[in-house]
């Protein structure tokens, strides 16, 4: 009891903490405080009296001590820029437990057969019990759970729900929302380092919710009443106001100087828009954008706002405004028209005679009903047509909100506590894999940006795979799996002033466009297992026994043997070598045709783990594994298909296997998995198709199998596969069939988005694809220009990777030559 009292006192002393008066911490501190102030007098009496409590009561006091200590840890561990949403979910999962334990404690005291101190009369205990029971609060965690369910079902969450979440978690302004997104990314980074896959997926879902809050603010801003439409790219993502002093940060994004400076001064060294770590904090004036804005304002008689008089960063664009005026985020934002009639907007609407800054979303002709239109045809006053037949365009946000972030199946068992489905929870939480469920965690660094790479089995502690090297594009534009070339073009940089303003306009891109799997830092590879390795002779003996069991006619024996081999192959490279030399590979390949799904899953996962060793790669291919792997790809369980695709990728690292796999008919099933598989399966299929697309003969087969349509769909940031999809598309863009498919499927607008807002590697690959499209087709060249590719290409030519700069400069040079050529023929 003395320990409990010390814990209560420690918690109450937190009232002097510097963060305790911040929202939402003050609210939750008071809730815990109310519970403990009812409990403390009772605990004081028990300690000072001779009362002897029984085992049940003693256990209740122990649980209370643990709960109080947990709450202390939660409040003490919160730092500036920690996630508020994550804190709320954690504390709300603890509060009901603490409250119930206190109720149980009081009831145990009332029913105790031991003599109670006079101060603990039944009446006083009953009074305390009633106080506790009446301390009930609305739990926002249940609202968040509902929003996550709606999100996974593709029906929401609604604006009202977003407002409710924002109000109850202290996210009421644009800056608070942007900081929360960064905080959740960092929280996810920690979960990734500890390989807590369920937590990573859960945090991904929360990040999408926060992104939608930001999208809502943008939508409010863009739908404000105005007689003049303004380019969305003239708005600062931080201030949501038109920029008067635009500057470029190291990520290549442009912000209002005063706002991004204050952001950096807060200690935030992350780009608010792309979440990339800022490599330096130098702010480079963007004179081109500044001139364009000034010219536009003069043409349209619009007065620029005074940045010094702008609303405080902490009071920007309140989320609460216009709840009923903005369509649901579950609706197709990009396929609606916004009326020009006056609305009762929030206080940020213009009250002067001058037009206020806004954007009006209009329908884009030919927009696919199955995918949000990425360009919307609202013409901007003061910008006319041009020799290329350009129609200056602008539009609303990319509506990634309709698509659920369909990562590995996730559900919430309790507020703030995420888990995967019941069939897989054990393997994720305990770091173990059941016989029928083989989860893989990263064993290699991603080759496409920082997205997840085909991996070995759960808790893989092996060395990085030798094939895990960055994708880079060669001179032809094709991307290869290999070190990025350090050479860069000597093309002279040109200012945007070389281009007419006619080429500057573009439709609004997803202003908060990001990839759920984008990292703030590189993935940490697990250290070798701490378990003491057994003597190799012991492993050899065990493997020899298991190889004999693989030959058994008993399904149970085969199932158990394949499961044990899979686990052995998971642990370390020595085991893989022993198994590879034991003759097990041929038998495992044969078992890929097993009618027992568990045996088949074990066999394919064992082969995947074994293939991490390069010698085993060759042995697996020589054992005739390609066709059996295709059989699994076509007929296996979801997890077996995933691991089959990952194994095919691993084998395709060897050049001759690329040809064998392509000629064996694997491309069709891989494309089917790409379009219809699980999120994990889609990633594995995309990575396998990337390696296969390096071989020239495979490219046409990949296009003919319908891969381009699926790849373009997977460029939706919510899918977490933007970089993977762009890498494959860049290779396919080197053949005519690939270019035609990309153009026909609407890939050009999305590639331009990646150039503007993607990761460093994504920008490079997207620029390579656009270069192929533009230089080989006048029609596609015009489409690229119409999508407003020039400004992001100029930014990329100055701040991208060496090869990205080379591609961007080559494309800008081509545009310039085309324009001058057309002028000469005039």
UniProtKB/Swiss-Prot annotation:
Biased composition (Low complexity): 416-428
One of the Pfam families matching this protein, by short name: Arm
Region ranges (Disordered): 330-501
SMART domains with a match to the protein in the record: ARM, Ubox
GO biological process: protein ubiquitination
Pathway named in the protein's UniProt entry: Protein modification; protein ubiquitination
Residue runs in coiled coils: 172-204
Modified residues (Phosphoserine): 396
Gene3D superfamilies reported in the protein's UniProt record: Leucine-rich Repeat Variant (1.25.10.10), Zinc/RING finger domain, C3HC4 (zinc finger) (3.30.40.10)
Domain U-box, first and last residues per copy: 229-303
Signal peptide, first to last residue: none
Biased composition (Basic and acidic residues): 391-414, 492-501
Entry's Gene Ontology molecular function annotations: ubiquitin-protein transferase activity
Keyword tags: Coiled coil, Phosphoprotein, Repeat, Transferase, Ubl conjugation pathway
EC number assigned by the record: 2.3.2.27
ARM repeat coordinates: 530-570, 573-612, 614-653, 655-694, 696-734, 736-775, 778-817
Disulfide bonds: none
Ranges annotated as biased composition (Polar residues): 347-360
Substrates-to-products reaction catalysed: S-ubiquitinyl-[E2 ubiquitin-conjugating enzyme]-L-cysteine + [acceptor protein]-L-lysine = [E2 ubiquitin-conjugating enzyme]-L-cysteine + N(6)-ubiquitinyl-[acceptor protein]-L-lysine
Function according to Swiss-Prot or TrEMBL: Functions as an E3 ubiquitin ligase.
The protein, known as: U-box domain-containing protein 4
